[in-house]
Amino acid sequence: MTQDDPGKMHSDWIAKVVEDVLEPEIPILDPHHHLWLDEGHTGWPYTLEDFHQDTGSGHNIVGTVFLECHAEYRKDGPIHMQPVGETEFIARIAEQSAVSGGAEIKAIQANADVSLGA
């Protein structure tokens, strides 16, 4: 394996640990995850499909909270509105997650640069 394929490296790293499913009847709200389409964040995209693969391991993950990660910002427009692109992106993905049969994105913790003022 070379460092030319960071997505494969990540998959191999994840596969090193398999968690036992303890008490699968207990509903879990995962309070922290990210999604992104580009490779700039980590060297590979992390999509709803990847998210469902990770959360579909047998644990009873009934919902999740997306935390901002500077993904899918608007490329143009006023700088104070560029983070809204991430919220729009995740809102669309959350709608898809609601009908997918997998873990559902229940909340979004978004970003706004308050140092820009009102």
Spans of features found by a protein language model:
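Helix-coil boundary/capping segments in enzymes
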Residues: 1-118
